[in-house]
Amino acid sequence: MSGAAHADRRDSTVGLDADVLAAGAVLWRHGTQSPELALVHRPRYDDWSFPKGKVDPGETMPFTAVREVAEETGQAARLGPVLDDVRYTVPEGRKLVRYWAAEALGGEFVPGDETDELRWVDPAHAAEMLSYRHDVDVLERFTALGPPASMVLLVRHAKAGSRHQWDGHDMLRPLSETGREQARQLARLLALFGPDRIASASPVRCRQTVAPLAEKLGLPVLDEPLLGETEFAQDPEAGLARFRELAAEPGVSVLCSQGGVIPHIVGALATAAGLPGVDPDDVPSRKGSTWALAFGEDTTLRAADYYPRPTG
């Protein structure tokens, strides 16, 4: 991963100043010398663009991006970093399209009414083929970042039962009913990133938060005791070093931790990388929220996207 790093908190459709919301992706796969990107031809407009489409009622924008990629290219995909928001005017009013980088996982293109041709091209050819300047801008953002070498989805546990009403050891305090529903919603969001492994700090509420995802994907939940609040407070450097080891694992890792850990890790990584957009003294970390952290080959943080806890 090379080029300019970035941080992004544009994670929710709430409050977006647009009449039409859409989502799409720069879909990439490994090529011989550079990534190959998927461009689709739309016969209705006779143009070449990245796969994208409108957000359906009840959908989240990340889900829309993955669904539209599948519908327009036939490819399964896993999301990477957010690239950009594109705004322009259509007959229905102001339109906003949010783009992710997304890795192609395989599939077969079938021509249809919406897209009748799919081409895999290198970034230079993509810049020549794209019909719209705003798509070229998105391409330039992707080229600047490059495909991530690895990602960590750093999740704060969902809402737990009241500490004051719990008689047992705090490590054993479980999720509340609200927290269990948040965990189920998180499973739907996190699955869009195609996790390869799932890990958790030791508290029961952390493990319960990622349990629905583990069940959905058929993966075990690995224990990461150094990344719980108590252990991290005793030796932050050891905890941060362990997190860097996890970030060096290829593919996508999920780690569920706590509010006393996540801001420290994100702030330290962003400061070390000189990442704009993250204030190390004000790192959000609400219960049920996720930081999607993308890393380069040297495990330097390259992009950071904050997703508040899902609401549906």
Put a short name on every predicted segment.
Residues 33-76, 166-173, 178:
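Conserved Nudix-box catalytic region and its N-terminal flanking loop in Nudix hydrolases
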Residues 53, 58, 64, 148-235, ...:
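Active-site-proximal alpha-helix that buttresses catalytic centers in soluble enzyme cores
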Residues 240-300:
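Active-site-adjacent alpha-helix immediately C-terminal to a catalytic or transition-state-stabilizing loop
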Residues 2-50, 152-157:
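N-terminal strand-loop-strand
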Residues 21, 94-100, 151, 289-291:
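Short beta-strand micro-motifs in enzyme catalytic cores
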Residues 43-45, 304-312:
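Short, solvent-exposed aromatic-acidic interface loops
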Residues 55-79, 86-138, 143:
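Unchanged
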Residues 27, 41, 99-103, 120, ...:
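Short, well-ordered beta-strand micro-motif
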